[in-house]
Amino acid sequence: MSNVTGAGGKWVDDVESLALYGYPECPYCRRVLNAIAVLEIDVPLRNTMIDSDHNAALLAATGRETVPVLRIEKQEGSIRWLPESLDIVRFLTDRFDRETKAMKQG
């Protein structure tokens, strides 16, 4: 079952699950975490500073340890790794912000 719901509990797009790789002390990660809180979505943090398995998964998938990176798993099973805090915030806002969606439709 999807862990990706927006405000009001509606399931979003074709995304099955999201996970943010980073750590709370990182200012760029903080930017993404703040957006997640404002959008009221459930995105687990995979703390790369305290869990070497998360850090290894990030390095294996992206070839780098730079954070934040959003792991996006689609329903059909494909996985995308999205780096850069502003790109992540834009991705999340485009999919989960009701006001942004209403402006695009109207």
Residue ranges and their predicted role:
Residues 1-25, 30-106:
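GST-like domain detector, emphasizing the conserved glutathione-binding G-site
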